[in-house]
């Protein structure tokens, strides 16, 4: 396969990246590479690198209501939390194509949430485990917090 980038775009790209600073260059395809097209036109996108997420930053929260106890309800709520986290990171400028988190801890948290005492409402949060610049992976942890008026709660551990 051949990736075709207009010369004018390459010239503009060179003008920008020769300036002082750290730059992130993305190549956006105008064709469908997966279909096996022999020639694909693409366009460069360049932007200054900057921090988009700070370590310890709360990225998203949700509440798991007392009556939400089935595996499907818990899974749905956790998926919603992950989606909200990813959306916020994208709005803040992140280019990562997903989130990184410990799958064993995710599964353990899901089991703990399903097995929690009856009538317990819990607040969940997604927190960044490290600083991330525009092109860095987004590493998060999901935490179980005590909701107002509920019994003491725990949190997932990395």
Role assignments for model-derived ranges:
Residues 1-158:
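Membrane-proximal structural modules of membrane-associated proteins and complexes
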